[in-house]
Amino acid sequence: MVLSPADKTNVKAAWGKVGAHAGDYGAEALERMFLSFPTTKTYFPHFDLSHGSAQVKGHGKKVADALTNAVAHVDDMPNALSALSDLHAHKLRVDPVNFKLLSHCLLVTLAAHHPAEFTPAVHASLDKFLASVSTVLTSKYR
């Protein structure tokens, strides 16, 4: 999915507002995903998935850091996320549908924390951005 210049501006502005809360939002989105889509828990059998778990917080930070990297390299996400794509495709073997589920939960989390900034245009841009990230992460599944 091609991001327009306006989309890139919206994504950078929205992610900039996330700032120091990125890890917390990542963890919240993961918790939301585990509650809303319980089958996603199968990829984390070794995690304590309870609310506020240090393991969920740690993985939420990894998710947020990867998205921060993608925002910083929005014009070259395939190279920026190459190692992460390899990891999810070849070692973790995460079903690609789960990226869509987490993307949805991230959008809900961002909208809940930043309702004034979460305009329809920003929502659409973030949705396109997360779809692009998902596409990159699943590109090595073939």
From Swiss-Prot:
Please indicate which superkingdom the organism of origin belongs to.
Eukaryota
Q: List, alphabetically, the Pfam families matched.
A: Globin
Q: Mind telling me which InterPro entries this protein's record contains? A: Globin (IPR000971), Globin-like_sf (IPR009050), Globin/Proto (IPR012292), Hemoglobin_a-typ (IPR002338), Hemoglobin_oxygen_transport (IPR050056), Hemoglobin_pi (IPR002339)
Q: GO biological process annotations for this chain's record?
A: hydrogen peroxide catabolic process
Its GO CC terms are:
blood microparticle; haptoglobin-hemoglobin complex; hemoglobin complex
Query: Which annotated residues bind O2?
Result: 59
Binding, heme b: 88
Q: Manganese as a keyword?
A: no
The record's family statement is:
Belongs to the globin family.
Quaternary state and partners of this protein?
Answer: Heterotetramer of two alpha chains and two beta chains.
State the name under which the record lists this protein.
Hemoglobin subunit alpha-1
Q: What is the lineage of its organism?
A: Eukaryota, Metazoa, Chordata, Craniata, Vertebrata
